[in-house]
UniProtKB/Swiss-Prot annotation:
A motif (GAR) lies at residues 202-206. Residues 481-551 are annotated as: Necessary for interaction with SRSF3, SRSF7 and TRA2B/SFRS10. Residues 389-404, 489-503, 515-551 have a biased composition (Basic and acidic residues). This is Cleavage and polyadenylation specificity factor subunit 6. Residues 504-514 have a biased composition (Basic residues). Residues 404-551 are annotated as: Sufficient for nuclear speckle localization. Residues 81-161 form the RRM domain. Contains an Arg/Ser-rich domain composed of arginine-serine dipeptide repeats within the C-terminal region that is necessary and sufficient for activating mRNA 3'-processing and alternative polyadenylation (APA). The modification Phosphoserine is found at residues 494, 500, 511, 513, 525. Gene3D superfamilies: 3.30.70.330. Belongs to the RRM CPSF6/7 family. The lineage of its organism: Eukaryota, Metazoa, Chordata, Craniata, Vertebrata.
Length: 551
């Protein structure tokens, strides 16, 4: 085309676009989210392609000024009716729900959105379904509750806050009852409820029927075999991330399956498998554990047959890692992490664990009386290769003295520490005596106690000269304590001996002498209150004078 024709075509369509907006006024009320998830047109074009076709110039043979009709066929009329479908199992996927709805003759599904727990991403058992006509919604409300979906009859309700709160309460009750009984929820038939299924079976606002990506891989589904087969275009659902109950031994992956490397970059969000849950009895890098079968567990590849039940769990489980699960065996050893309680640790010459690992989640192995599942060699004393702790027995010097004995101090260091301790002792005694003479016994006692603790914590506390300093401080402390508690009674006893008064008078004097300290403190507090009252009166008088002056 020539340049002039292009300019004419572009600016001539402006009027048509305004006519189209007036003709399809119902589109103003359509949410942008609904436009994205709406089904394709009859000609197989995506919504983006339709928008692009709207802006294409007409052909040369068309009349530009006549306002030709648009070449896009709109199948969505802008009407959208939302329903809640509840009483579903947690492993029900959007494909299952779509098949059940299509079996009723309803083909205008616009949206299926499952409500999920924020903590683990597990379905709450109800979903929001949007259809494009009133007849479809009535058909769903009448016929779908009569259909059985995974052993349960769905409940179809209108979309409002009342039914939403009812479904939320029901999901909380089911979660709490499952936790109280100590058992996980019932899993899908033919597989283990604790198997690590990839995420992607349940749609999050996607149009139902989307084929999942080809890079998904199923995890092990039981104690020793691959998961059950699923139909084409349908992925297995996700289990709860933290199922209660004792973990069992993992099974090998299906034959001929290649797992992606653990550090190959983050996958797409929709195709990302859920992070594996690690228990304290499971090495890092292995698939999640399945339930215990009735009878002896099958042998684990690469570790030999376990002779008995798994050891009890010790400590809290570590947080789920960001790596996909890997099978044991020839794929390589797990990452540099501390071993679980029932497996031997690395040899003493092995490198320490990575800095991002919290050692508190991986306690060292203890002798719990259970046989280990590995007999390749005696386990070392410490998983990090540290020397064994020194056992002093029930009696012996404390650890500080042992450190002093191991690393002897030089003469200069010893004299420096001793001079420091002497200065602390002399200053503490002088200050305590001055405080006690002023009547502040609490400050004097605190000063002496602090000095004693500082000298005891020094490196030369085991020396005889240091012990002499400590004993002098303790004698001063006892003297001040006895003086603070019994000063009044001593005065009265001396008066008794000098004046030989009667017992009644001595009792009176004792009570008076005991009350003198209290009266002294009370009088001081009263004086403080009087000063405060005087200050308040002065402030009030000043305020009054200021107000009077302003008038």
């Amino acid at each position: 085309m020539a340049d002039g024709v292009d300019h004419i075509d572009i600016y001539a369509d402006v009027g048509e676009e305004f006519n189209q907006e007036a003709e399809y006024g119902g589109h103003d009320q359509i949410d942008l989210y609904d436009d994205v998830i709406s089904p394709s047109a009859n000609n197989g074009d995506a919504p983006e392609d339709r928008d692009y076709m709207d802006t294409l110039p007409p052909t040369v043979g068309d009349d530009v000024g006549k306002g030709a009709a648009p070449n896009v066929v709109y199948t969505y009329t802008g009407k959208r009716i939302a329903l809640y479908i509840g009483n579903l199992t947690w492993w029900t996927t959007d494909e299952d729900l779509t098949e059940a709805v299509h079996s009723l003759g309803v083909n205008d599904i616009l949206e299926i959105k499952f409500f999920e727990n924020r903590a683990n991403g597990q379905s709450k058992g109800f979903a929001l379904v949007g259809v494009g006509s009133e007849a479809s919604s009535k058909k769903l409300m009448d016929l779908l509750p009569k259909r059985e979906l995974h052993g349960q009859n769905p409940v179809v309700t209108p979309c409002n806050k009342q039914f939403l709160s009812q479904f939320e309460m029901q999901s909380r009750k089911t979660t709490q009852s499952g936790q109280m009984s100590g058992e996980g929820k019932a899993g899908p038939p033919g597989g283990s409820s604790r198997a690590a299924f990839p995420q992607g079976g349940r749609g999050r606002g996607r149009f139902p029927g989307a084929v999942p990506g080809g890079d998904r891989f199923p995890g092990p589904a039981g104690p020793g075999g691959p998961p059950p087969p699923f139909p084409a275009g349908q992925t297995p659902p996700r289990p709860p991330l933290c199922p209660p109950g004792p973990p069992g031994p993992p099974g090998p992956p299906p034959p001929g399956q290649v797992l992606p490397p653990p550090l190959a970059g983050p996958p797409n969000r929709g195709d990302r498998p859920p992070p594996p849950v690690l228990f304290p009895g499971q090495p890092f890098g292995q698939p999640p554990l399945g339930p215990l079968p009735p009878g002896p567990p099958p042998p684990v590849p690469g570790y030999g047959p376990p002779p008995g039940p798994p050891p009890p769990q010790q400590g809290p489980p570590p947080p789920p890692g960001p790596f996909p699960p890997r099978p044991p065996g020839p794929l390589g050893p797990p990452l540099t992490l501390a071993p679980p309680p029932h497996l031997p640790g690395p040899p003493p010459g092995a490198p320490p664990p990575a800095p991002h690992v919290n050692p508190a989640f991986f306690p060292p192995p203890t002798n719990s009386g259970m046989p280990t599942s590995d007999s390749r060699g005696p386990p070392p004393t410490d998983p990090y290769g540290r020397p064994p702790p020194y056992d002093r027995g029930d009696y012996g010097p404390p650890g500080r003295e042992m450190d002093t004995a191991r690393t002897p101090l030089s003469e200069a260091e010893f004299e420096e520490i001793m001079n420091r301790n002497r200065a602390i002792s002399s200053s503490a005694i002088s200050r305590a005596v001055s405080d006690a003479s002023a009547g502040d016994y609490g400050s004097a006692i605190e000063t002496l106690v602090t000095a004693i603790s500082l000298i005891k914590q020094s490196k030369v506390s085991a020396d005889d000269r240091c012990k002499v300093l400590i004993s002098s401080l303790q004698d001063c402390l006892h003297g001040i304590e006895s003086k603070s508690y019994g000063s009044g009674s001593r005065r009265e006893r001396s008066r008794e001996r000098d004046h030989s008064r009667s017992r009644e008078k001595s009792r009176r004097h004792k009570s008076r002498s005991r009350d003198r300290h209290d009266d002294y403190y009370r009088e001081r507090s009263r004086e403080r209150e009087r000063h405060r009252d005087r200050d308040r009166d002065r402030d009030r008088e000043r305020d009054r004078e200021r107000e009077y002056r302003h008038r």
